[in-house]
Amino acid sequence: MIEGHGDDLYRYDNIKMNFSSNIYNGTDLSALNAYLCTRLDAIRTYPEPSAASLEQMIALECGISPDEVLVTSGAVDAIYLIAQTYRHEGTCHILQPTFREYEDACRVFGYQESEDGALCWLCNPNNPTGDVLAAEDVLALAERHRLLIVDQSYEDYTVAPLLRPADVVGRDNVILLHSMTKRYAVPGLRLGYVTASSAIISRLREQYRPWAINALSLEAGKWLVQRGVTAIPDLPSYLAETQRLRAMLNEVEGIEAHDTLTNFFLCTIRQTTAARLKEYLAHEHGILIRDASNFTGLTPHHFRIATQSPAENDALVAAIMNYVLN
């Protein structure tokens, strides 16, 4: 799905506040920027064919073996790699509404949707709803499918307990997806990784393209893992701000801000469509939200927002209130 993702900032010239991406925009990346400026000569040579040095660092951090980790060019790269590798299984089940790339990747490789499909795709925490499925319920899904893929890209944006890599590497049918893009707020670098049993990782490597991770992304990834600083230094406060924002939006007539266990959540607007609200906010206030109508199972009235700073959140509520009242 090239079109239809959030964070379509490139379509607009005047955006000052971006609620469209689920990533927090206030992260200070100046130290990373300075480091990368010292590593620009890395582009003169080919990078490692398989990002092995970064995989070793991630394995150490997770308490697992390097042969149980596969670094990819973002979580989406992993999604298509998994769909390609297991394409002969033929059937899949996707828990909806959720991230569209599971559906698109399965369509590309000829899967048929079936409730008891061989592959089961789960986003946990779920995009776009912000729901979190308990770990025991996730593992129960693994009992009903040949392979369970759990996308934990937003694991750093919730305090709810989730599966850890060490919980799944001993299982022969569970894959976890992780997003360094989300963890460190670096979407332009395209970095993610898979954790699973060594047998699953070995099978994925058979379809893995060489030099999938460019030299600067590899340098950045190692620098970020070594320092271990995530995008949100005070997650409880950030999630409390999310609930404050939800409460304010629920006071606006015609707006319903749905429950969430993450920093992002769905809203519905009764009076108009999400697409119209999005265009109004973008052109009149320089605010970008996510029209969520293209998620399977949602309606033209659904939109998604991700919490930003208190001042930006107040500005968003005021702008939506102005639209509703006028």
Residue ranges: model-predicted function:
Residues 30, 272-279, 311-315:
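Short, conserved charged micro-motifs
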Residues 51-55, 65-89:
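Conserved beta-loop-alpha segment that forms the PLP phosphate-binding cup at the N-terminus of a helix
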Residues 73, 85-107, 112:
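Conserved PLP-anchoring active-site segment centered on the Schiff-base-forming lysine
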Residues 28-31, 50, 173-251, 256-258:
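PLP-dependent aminotransferase class I/II
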